[in-house]
Amino acid sequence: MTSLDILGIGNAIVDVLARAEDAFLARHGMAKGGMALIGPDDAERIYADMGPGIESSGGSAANTCAAAAALGAKVGYLGKVADDALGQVFRHDINAAGVRFPTAPLVGGAPTARCLILVSPDGQRTMNTFLGACVTLGEADLDEAAIAAAQVTYLEGYLFDPPAAQAAFRAAARIAHAAGRRVAITLSDPFCVERHRDAFRAFVRDEADILFANEAEICALYQTDNFEAAATIAQSEIDLAALTRSEKGSLILTATTAHEVAAEATTVVDTTGAGDAYAAGFLAALTAGRELAECGRWASVAAAEAISHFGARPQADLKALVAG
């Protein structure tokens, strides 16, 4: 019997969110809407210049896991935090969300990762990530039994940045496939895709069963400005792709079918975690045996909830929302 519906593997990060004008981004040389990796000195400098904000447990795959658990899925998560105050906050929060988190903390090394997120007046988020303890996630941290017992192992594309984590990522895919399970990957960020395009393309083509990407990410992967062209390539290379297009909704592709899913109407407050929530809704429905069109509807409902408030974790009753 499958003990988990979804097992997420990603960078365990504490988010620090604050509002910021475009001038703030320009002053610090940030590319609006992107994610940049920063060192400890830059993290201190940017943090000191940020206005009032909120701290909450984050990380892309962890956000997906929390939202999927809120939708009733049985969920686990693997990611590395330090044995420090932020690490304890992360562990408490993800356990409180109903997600199993067995990874042992890092002792005596780098601090727990944090992501400094600047939310612009138009709701766009610009992220600056200090990976800290994240980079130490390795194959020794993999829970092979959990991976083998999960319907879907969900891998966060940001793990292509730390070499040890990328190796763990590939090992997890091998374990999942050896057990006859499915592997999903989210591309995470167009800049991350550009840093590791060849590795991403090979993984998507040869090792992944399910792909999540937004318009910018899928176009970056296939080096085109044409979404339709990128979608056509994706359809030929992967069993199942869910491609999001913000207010244009999403496109769900198999080798022989295409489902267009409308975006749910909502007021955009903060786009942080929209893609994470979309993946959560989709995978929660998929592992519950729903049809693909219904998976897309759950995904759109979850994404709309995520962007309707400040912060990435759900604040409304997602089960009630998808029951609609």
What are the functions of these language-model segments?
Residues 1-78, 88-89:
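Glycine-rich phosphate/adenosyl-contacting loop at the front of the ribokinase-like
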Residues 102-106, 117-163:
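Conserved phosphate-binding/catalytic loop of the ribokinase/pfkB sugar-kinase fold
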Residues 68, 214, 275:
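Short, conserved phosphate/pyrophosphate- and ester-handling motifs at nucleotide-, phospho-/glycolipid
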Residues 152-232, 248-250:
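Conserved beta-alpha-beta core of the PfkB/ribokinase-like small-molecule kinase fold
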Residues 1-7, 12-13, 26-32, 37, ...:
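Conserved phosphate-binding/catalytic region of the ribokinase-like
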Residues 93-110:
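A glycine-rich helix N-cap at a beta->alpha junction
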Residues 75, 101, 183-184, 241:
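Hydrophobic beta-strand scaffold residues
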